[in-house]
Amino acid sequence: MTPCLLIAGPTAAGKTALSLAAAERVGGEIINADSMQVYAGLPLITAQPDAAERARAPHHLFGSIDPAIRYSVGQWTSDVLALISDIRGRGNVPILVGGTGLYFNALTRGLAPVPEIGDAARARAAALLDADGLAGLRAEALRLDPVATNRVDAADRQRLLRIVEVGFETGTALSVFQADTVPPLEPAAWRGIVIEPDREALYRRIDQRFEHMLEAGALDEVAAFMQRDLDPDLPASKALGVPPLIAHLRGEMSLDEARDNAKRDSRRYAKRQGTWFRNQAASWSRIGTLDSEAAISALADILDQPPG
């Protein structure tokens, strides 16, 4: 059985082009592993593959979830395992592509069986963050679960919130749940590739890509999204670029300010992604260029090597 191919990397690193090259080379079908690209209604601002790209290979879980839904990593994992089975049943190779490290961890290391977080625990953690800031949130996370907290970046707001929410909801440390997990994919069933480009070159591409998004109509897309009046705490409402463009549309900042904030947020996110993949996917193969042709050539070399 040909292993699944996992292609990861920071935002704007060229993962879509690489996944298409891989699909055409091995007879693959592409599965989304980006937590924002799952949502409908935001194809431009979340950089989902366009119609021409989708025509080159079958694509799954892109723009398929209503943004009013909180789509959890557990739901994603369940959906992906079913897709992997279907794709293999057709004799094709599953190719998972994206930048959400938690998704890749869920597949390759297992998903902790944490109970559903209730509204009260979620609100309590959010109130703590509002009152005491990120430093206060991290202090509470360290109190509740020093093991899990010391594994995450001190600036990783989402993961720190998760640690605190689990502690508030269950009275048990997240690391306790994580200690007894079985990975859905055995090591022999997958091989991983990380795109790890020069940081300054990546930052330039991030800035250029956001300009292209605006030219393609991202502001109108966000305006339509805004009309749904969704909870600003929903994951889709926090997609990169969405909050500053909404602030601009509400008259709270100029378009130039929104543009600068969106680029800044994307660069910071890319930095966190790079750190995560260096630490959590250290054994994966590396591609260190943003040049599409060079990256595809490097991919071919990796695929020519025997798995393992």
Swiss-Prot record:
Tell me which family the UniProt entry assigns to this protein: Belongs to the IPP transferase family.
Task: Please identify the protein, giving its name as recorded.
Answer: tRNA dimethylallyltransferase
Q: Which HAMAP family match?
A: IPP_trans
Among the Pfam families in the record, one is: IPPT
What are the boundaries of the region Interaction with substrate tRNA?
A: 34-37, 158-162
* InterPro entries cross-referenced by the UniProt entry: Dimethylallyltransferase, IPT, P-loop_NTPase
Give the residues the record marks as binding ATP.
G9, P10, T11, A12, A13, G14, K15, T16
Q: Which organism is it from?
A: Maricaulis maris (strain MCS10)
- Reactions the enzyme catalyzes: adenosine(37) in tRNA + dimethylallyl diphosphate = N(6)-dimethylallyladenosine(37) in tRNA + diphosphate
The record's function comment reads:
Catalyzes the transfer of a dimethylallyl group onto the adenine at position 37 in tRNAs that read codons beginning with uridine, leading to the formation of N6-(dimethylallyl)adenosine (i(6)A).
Q: What stretch or stretches form a coiled coil here?
A: none
Subunit and interaction comment: Monomer.
- What positions does the entry give for substrate binding? T11, A12, A13, G14, K15, T16
What biological-process terms (Gene Ontology) are attached?
tRNA modification
Q: What is its EC number?
A: 2.5.1.75
Q: Which NCBIfam families match?
A: miaA
Which UniProt key words apply to this protein?
ATP-binding, Magnesium, Nucleotide-binding, Transferase, tRNA processing
Q: What are the recorded GO MF terms, alphabetically?
A: ATP binding; tRNA dimethylallyltransferase activity
List the cofactors: Mg(2+)
Task: Tell me which residues are marked as the site Interaction with substrate tRNA.
Answer: T100, R122
